């Protein structure tokens, strides 16, 4: 029994060399196999390469020779363009109208030949082959080879047939799209008329809902020089209304009280009669235009009133919010920028102004004199660009009819007294760390 145990340990060491030997022997066998496999693979690869080259030459020769044989009289320019057609369908469409123009010369020859160049219909290549055979038998014999795969592609001929129709359609469409730009141009000329009248309504006509952003863009362009220059740019259009508004406060109320009706009579005074129908399209929207020249003074008259008034018109509770309006207005301005709901303001404007339209004239009279309050837009201007804020203020103020300062209750008198802050006292007495655990 003690004898058998010693022999097992010696066999243990030999196995690693046996593994090494096996590893060395296996690659020898695999090398022989690899040599045989390599020879077969090389032969196969050589054969495939030769076949690929021959196929490429066979396929390319007839495609290039067809246009050459058919368009020999037409010139090499057609041959150079037709391969582009094969690469790009747009080129084929461009070539087909040329074929249609020259179709009077050869109806069966050229258009059918151009189509096969663009991977076109299978039925037509035989026609091209028929036209090519009298020219060159070699071309026809070579052409039959590519035509067979093309015939095997029925979907492509179907596509090519609609392409022929689409080519004609594209012809009409190519001729048609230019007319729409003139149509747009035709639509554009009426806009320049309103552009002369007021640059904002032009966008209003094009886009009913987004007019307000459009108006904001225009005042931004008009307003960037400064709020006072904002008045002069509309003034060329509203030269009569601007000075009249400054000299006579009553005109603003007509704009504000009945937004729809007075604009009709006021518009002929501002501009020529033929543009009246265009104005009826944007009666409510043109009110902001003239009001812009007049609206900035009321804000200037009382910036706090504007700040307090902007929240009230939606809520219709100005006196309640008049006490501490200044913080909310910036939020409302941002909200108006994010989502300017022009239609509701117009509805609100149309429904509310009769009640609010009467009081505004006194503020317009009072503010016409003092223009110092433009600093509030400057405050926002530090946050944002001054020009955009000014233009936005002009547009936003023009939408709403604000209550005069007289309507709001007088603010409480300010009494100076020392205010005790518990946080500071606690920090001084106990220190900051013990307080949070007590609060928690």
From Swiss-Prot:
Ranges where the record places region Binds actin: 49-52
Residue intervals of the WH2 domain: 36-53
Family classification: Belongs to the verprolin family.
Annotated GO MF terms: actin binding
Predominant subcellular localization, coarse grouping: cytoplasm
Segments of skewed composition (Pro residues): 1-18, 176-193, 222-236, 249-262, 356-378
InterPro entries in UniProt: WH2_dom
Region: Disordered, residue numbers: 1-36, 56-387, 419-440
Asymmetric dimethylarginine, modified sites: 37
GO cellular component: cytoskeleton; cytosol
Source species, domain of life: Eukaryota
Subcellular location: Cytoplasm, Cytoskeleton
Cysteines joined through disulfide linkages: none
Function: Plays an active role in the formation of cell surface protrusions downstream of activated PDGFB receptors. Plays an important role in actin-microspike formation through cooperation with WASL. May cooperate with WASP and WASL to induce mobilization and reorganization of the actin filament system.
Species name: Homo sapiens (Human)
UniProt note on tissues of expression: Expressed mainly in brain, colon, lung and stomach (at protein level). Ubiquitously expressed, with high expression in brain, kidney, lung, and placenta.
Miscellaneous remark of the record: Access to the profilin-binding site is masked in the full-length protein.
Description of how the protein assembles with itself and partners: Interacts with WASL and WASP, and this interaction results in cytoplasmic relocation of these two proteins along actin filaments. Interacts with NCK2 resulting in the localization to sites of focal adhesions. No interaction was seen with WASF2 and WASF3.
Name of the protein this chain belongs to: WAS/WASL-interacting protein family member 2
Compositionally biased residues, Low complexity: 116-133
Keyword terms: Actin-binding, Cytoplasm, Cytoskeleton, Methylation
Segments of skewed composition (Polar residues): 161-172
């Amino acid at each position: 029994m003690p004898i058998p145990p010693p022999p097992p340990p010696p066999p243990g060491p030999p196995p690693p060399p046996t593994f090494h030997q096996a590893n060395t022997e296996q690659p020898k066998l695999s090398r022989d196999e690899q040599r045989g496999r390599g020879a077969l693979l090389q032969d196969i690869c050589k054969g495939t390469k030769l076949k690929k080259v021959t196929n490429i030459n066979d396929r390319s020769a007839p495609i290039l020779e067809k246009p050459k044989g058919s368009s020999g009289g037409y010139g090499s320019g057609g041959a150079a363009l037709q391969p582009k057609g094969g690469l790009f369908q747009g080129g084929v469409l461009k070539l087909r109208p040329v074929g249609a123009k020259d179709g009077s010369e050869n109806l069966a020859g050229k258009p059918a030949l151009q189509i096969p160049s663009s991977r076109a219909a299978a039925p037509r290549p035989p026609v091209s082959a028929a036209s090519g055979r009298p020219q060159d038998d070699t071309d026809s014999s070579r052409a039959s080879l590519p035509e067979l795969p093309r015939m095997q592609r029925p979907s492509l001929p179907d596509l090519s047939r609609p392409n022929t129709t689409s080519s004609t359609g594209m012809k009409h469409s190519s001729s048609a799209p230019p007319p729409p730009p003139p149509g747009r141009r035709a639509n554009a000329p009426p806009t320049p008329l309103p552009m002369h009248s007021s640059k904002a309504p032009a966008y209003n006509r094009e886009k009913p809902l987004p007019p307000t952003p459009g108006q904001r863009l225009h005042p931004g362009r008009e307003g960037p020089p400064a709020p006072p220059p904002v008045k002069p740019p509309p003034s060329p259009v509203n030269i009569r209304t601007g000075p009249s508004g400054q000299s006579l406060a009553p005109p603003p109320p007509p704009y504000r009280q009945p937004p729809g009706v007075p604009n009709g009579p006021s518009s002929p005074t501002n501009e020529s009669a033929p543009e009246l129908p265009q104005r009826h399209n944007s009666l409510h929207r043109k009110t902001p235009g003239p009001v812009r020249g007049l609206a900035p003074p009321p804000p200037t008259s009382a910036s706090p009133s504007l700040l307090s008034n902007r929240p009230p018109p939606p809520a219709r509770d100005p006196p309640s919010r008049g006490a501490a309006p200044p913080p909310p207005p910036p939020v409302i301005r941002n909200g108006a920028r994010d989502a300017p709901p022009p239609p509701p303001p117009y509805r609100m404007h149309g429904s509310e102004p009769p009640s609010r339209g009467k009081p505004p004239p006194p503020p317009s009279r009072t503010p016409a004199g003092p223009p110092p309050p433009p600093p509030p837009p400057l405050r926002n201007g530090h946050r944002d660009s001054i020009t955009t804020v000014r233009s936005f203020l002009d547009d936003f103020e023009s939408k709403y009819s604000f209550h005069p300062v007289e309507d709001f209750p007088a603010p409480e008198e300010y009494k100076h007294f020392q205010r005790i802050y518990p946080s500071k006292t606690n920090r001084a007495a106990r220190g900051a760390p013990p307080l949070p655990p007590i609060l928690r």
